[in-house]
């Protein structure tokens, strides 16, 4: 067995597809009309009720029990892109987690919660450029020095 994708219910496949392509640069690898699969493993499905065999009114909107998470190396640049998009409904502004990663959460066109955070490598590099040692970064982020070194070598 292998994991193949996560499927999101969408009301308009064309608008949803454009949203994910334009905002995140996702690439479609399969297009079946009412169903689109991106190369990252995210899929969009119009007429979700038909697909899984339930009444349309049982398809939930904004359940707040799952989020689609992305990491962005140019977080500030992405924020500028977001602020220029009138279709974006924000859950909140930018927050900084205890481990130092800045994130923002907002909704897609169908109410799915999305988180975009600074790439962890960038967080570590920001701390180091501000004069922190790896040991201090390790303590601040509650991550071992070995794991920090792995993250610093990680290339997307």
Language model regions located:
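Conserved short beta-strand elements that form part of the metal-binding/catalytic scaffold
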Residues: 27-62, 113-118
